[in-house]
Amino acid sequence: MKKYKVMLVSGGFDPVHKGHLEMIERAEQMAEEVWVILNNDTWLRNKKGKSFMSEKEREYIMSRIKGVTKTFICNPRTPSDKTVCDGIYSAVMTYRREYDSELSMAFGNGGDRGKGNVPEEDYCKSYDIDMVWNLGDKVQSSSWLIEKATNSAYSSSNG
């Protein structure tokens, strides 16, 4: 197994759950550092209609999780941009500022992603960033958690 200097992982982390933690733990096994790219609030509102926690709150939590070295909030140039390419670019520029070495970076993907369904794949190739697959199964979803909590609250109030 190749060992990287940096493994990038990304997500909404809204809210963070055990699947995210498994992804970070597996990334940590493959890299000296794990850098997390968080989707911003606008991205989440465009995808889900709302954000459960603010981007600053999510970044604060993620930055304190064991194994996470750096965090970046992705700020796409346009609201229609559904990628984290802006965050990848920020990570590459940070790497070049901090390390006087050839880029040793991978973009890690969870179990719900595979070749062909990751819009950042070509962008990563342009920077010689390797793609790593199966950093955990889709064991949980932030949307599932919010829906479950909402339904439980609704049932309790109507019970």
What are these regions (language model features)?
Residues M1-G159:
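Nucleotidyltransferase catalytic core that binds NTPs
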